[in-house]
Amino acid sequence: MAELKLRRSLLYVPGNMPSMLQNIPLFGCDAIQIDLEDAVPYSEKDAARILVRRFLEGYKNRNKEILVRINGLDTKWALDDLKAVLPALPDGIRLPKADSPEVVERLDTLLTEYEEEL
């Protein structure tokens, strides 16, 4: 089992804001959640995925836990979110609005399939 860490603070950062992504190393928090869901307008979702992936690939000194909040699995954006960010190995994926165990199981299946491809 993975070691559990106490998160005293979690900072939410919109995935479409390059200036905020660049400043993540400066924030004095335990964890960062980069949001690809509600914080990102529909017209900017594709660009936000690219920004988030590039940030994750370039952020080598991971002294903070980095989570990515994807769009809900019932949207047209969720699979693209996963395909974009999983290769950059975020510390975790946050699933919004999971209203049933089946939704969580579906995400588990998708993540397992991705891990098997590695």
Regions picked out by a protein language model, each given a short descriptive name:
Residues M1-L118:
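Expand to "…catalyze enediolate/carbanion chemistry for C-C bond making/breaking, isomerization
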